[in-house]
Swiss-Prot record:
Record's protein name: Small ribosomal subunit protein bS6
Gene giving rise to this polypeptide: rpsF
Keywords: Ribonucleoprotein, Ribosomal protein, RNA-binding, rRNA-binding
One term of GO molecular function: structural constituent of ribosome
Gene Ontology biological process terms from the UniProt entry: translation
Function: Binds together with bS18 to 16S ribosomal RNA.
Organism for this UniProt entry: Lacticaseibacillus paracasei (strain ATCC 334 / BCRC 17002 / CCUG 31169 / CIP 107868 / KCTC 3260 / NRRL B-441) (Lactobacillus paracasei)
Record CDD domains: bS6
Length: 98
């Protein structure tokens, strides 16, 4: 079965300190790896102003993960846990064509 490439972008609360942010990113990278994903790269993008207020925040820290996976198990688990984590304001998962 061929691996599918994905891009995961998520917005982290801006008031999270550096240690907590690093721990959050590592935890979600490990969730992807433990569920069969191969992480190509995981990087901070930048702190950006949001188009609209989310949970009383006007800005957020963007993080991007590029990965490949044979099935959608890792993506589904990330989606499930991303929805219930209060430190992640929003997340988006896109299937890449390249």
């Amino acid at each position: 079965m061929a691996e599918t490439k994905y891009e995961v972008t998520y917005i982290i609360r801006p008031d999270l300190d550096d240690a907590a942010k690093t721990e959050l990113v590592e935890r979600f990278d490990n969730i992807l790896k433990e569920n069969g994903a191969n992480i190509i790269d995981s990087k901070d993008w930048q702190k950006r102003k949001l188009a609209y207020e989310i949970n009383k925040y006007n800005e957020g820290l963007y993080h991007i993960v590029n990965l490949s996976a044979e099935d959608d198990k890792a993506i589904n688990e990330f989606d499930r846990l991303g929805k219930i984590n209060n430190d992640i304001l929003r997340h988006m998962i896109v299937k890449r064509e390249d």
